[in-house]
Amino acid sequence: MNKKLLVSFALASLTGISTQAKEKMSSETTQQRPNIILFMVDDMGWQDTSLPFWTQKTHYNEAYETPNMERLAKKGMMFTQAYACNISSATRCSLITGANNTRHRVTNWTLEKNKATDRPSNTIQLPDWNYNGVSQVTGTPNTFVGTSFVELLRQNGYHTIHCGKAHFGSIDTPGENPTHWGFEVNIAGHAAGGLATYLSEQNYGHTRDGKPYSLMAIPGLEDYWGTGIFATEALTQEAIKALDKAKKYNQPFYLYMAHYAIHVPVDKDMRFFPKYIKKGLSDKEAAYASLIEGMDKSLGDLMNWLEKNDEADNTVIIFMSDNGGLAAEPGWRDGQIHTQNAPLNSGKGSLYEGGIREPMIVSWPGVVTPDTRCDKYLIIEDFYPTILEMAGITNYETVNPIDGISFMPLLKGTGDPSKGRALVWNFPNIWGNDGPGINLDCSIRKDEWKLVYYYETGKKELFNIPNDISEKNDVAKQHPGIVKRLSKELGNYLRATGGQRPTFKATGLSLIHISE
């Protein structure tokens, strides 16, 4: 793949290139390329489904009902070791730019311009990370500039649709608007990474006179205010309307169906809530389950549309979540905190498996063998080159290095790009309450081994993931050679990509580098 780095990259020039590219595309070539749907769920844990991604069913799999995830898995391939970042913004910025979070430095969640969102510390000075997010154009401080794969799709003849959560850039920055990323249609996407409410009775976060009462108010759904339609359903209906229009165009489409579900608040989706109460779940857990099934219904509605419109055989569907399930805030879930993603340890915000391992499925008729599982690992930035390769785009230019590696060989069964490959995460931030693997740490996964390093204490933990999926047995003392080797590799990667680390306020000295 030829990815030349450009010295500068202007959005205006992209528009011109896009027009020329579309003129060159013949209708015959366009029709041969698949439609692509990336169905991204917010804060969905590895166990938040009736589809078992582990080797055995858990009580969570028994409690939840996601028949359309099961339906999709029958048509495609389940990935049991698909990784994202531990926080939404980091994942979505890696997705859209193909850069690892150590490189783009959007390591915590973003919202307001020029404002970091970290919880303050009396002893630790956090790095000046990119809290304004990512952008395709220069000129905004604390912003990573990268080339959008969606823009490349658009240049090469794809009709591009965004529906739901964006969370690429802070308020009043170029990156907050999905149309600045190559999306021709934007439905309800803006800077916020959450939502005020799923309820139309509250106008999704707006007062009666139409003013948002929260920065998390969902824009663009005014037609649904007061209708009794849950936000997940409203977004689905709008996505289907956009697909109805797209079908009239003589070009393939890319739909980024990026649900706000199942992010807090855990509002009750009354289409499903009573059923879970009858199943014996508590009020909180039944509400959480209703969010999950509402999301699953959306997936089924899109699959039904594809079948009804004779597009199912020519459409790739990728199902993914942006980080682990919420497990650190007792106000929204019942049960002991940090356990809601078991057998995985911890949850959202953590570099343990519960915070970064995601439920992922890929369906591609004629390419991916139906009803199969892949136990090889991959990471979110790999979606960038893979989706472009799916679209037949292999020769392109970017302003930033692409850290992702195509997982097409895994889809086709022709190779294993994960063998001997290191995956890296960096979180020199303080997200929320402390917990297992949460705050001020970095990590590397290579083959069966995973090292977690804590900046503040210098502690190193080593886990054999295939043998210890719950990360309960730290074997660092038993394998000092592996700890040393992974520490060096992680340290070298952080230096090479500009990975940041905190400092001590008292001395001004940087916290100990992992390889020091």
Feature annotation, model-predicted:
Residues 174-182, 264-270, 304-367, 379:
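Histidine-centered active-site microenvironments of extracellular/periplasmic hydrolases
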Residues 22-34, 41, 46, 78, ...:
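Long, internal low-complexity/basic segments
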Residues 32, 60-66, 83-87, 118, ...:
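A short beta-strand-to-alpha-helix junction
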Residues 230-247, 274-315, 332:
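A long, amphipathic alpha-helix that forms part
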Residues 21, 38-39, 46-147, 152, ...:
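Active-site segment of extracytoplasmic enzymes that catalyze sulfate/phosphate-ester chemistry
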Residues 53, 78-99, 107-114, 162-174, ...:
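Short, solvent-exposed turn/loop segments enriched in Gly/Ser/Thr/Pro and often Arg
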Residues 111-159, 166-251, 259-268, 282, ...:
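Formylglycine-dependent
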Residues 185, 190-193, 325-353, 368-376, ...:
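C-terminal cap/loop subdomain of S1 sulfatases and analogous C-terminal strand-loop tails that border
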